[in-house]
Amino acid sequence: SEEIPARMQKRAAAEFSQIFTSELEKVGLAYETANYFVTPRRITISIDGLPLQQATVVEERRGPRVDAPAPALDGFMRSNNISRDQIEERETKKGRFYFVEIETKGKLTKEVLPAIIETSLKKFAWPKSMRWGSNSFRWVRPLHSILAVFEAEVLHGELDLGHDKLVFTNMTKGHRCCGAEKISVANFADY
């Protein structure tokens, strides 16, 4: 972005990191460490130990009673997209019910991260913010780029600014006065 006011920098980096890690936890992505850094023109988050894929989740769903009318069982199977052979009967304190276990395979982390980045940016609230151009997105100063890399690959995503879109990239710029050339980033060491 352009110059972030000095009084806002440290708090902004800490808060943004907290929002981002909270979003990771919501989608079941565990991580080892999360570090944040701030400069007058950047907020940086580095997450170590992210898995390559979300964990597979097995959810148990209780259906109708065993003695319920057939349409109730048909509706349960249709709503869960299952067949009769996937259902089992179990005894509970309230009687005998049909149950099914639904297994949801985890998505690749690189497919989940772009939405987390966009959500985190939109959730973050600055004490004072602005819009620029004909965009509706608000930030402390105009955003120029979003560097987003996972496992040496650019994440395929974008931030919808309202009128324009800011596509994620693996490029950043050096110091604006002493070397503003573009720098390609594949990992945190490159950054």
PLM segments and residue spans:
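Long, basic N-terminal domains or extensions that often function
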Residues: 1-191
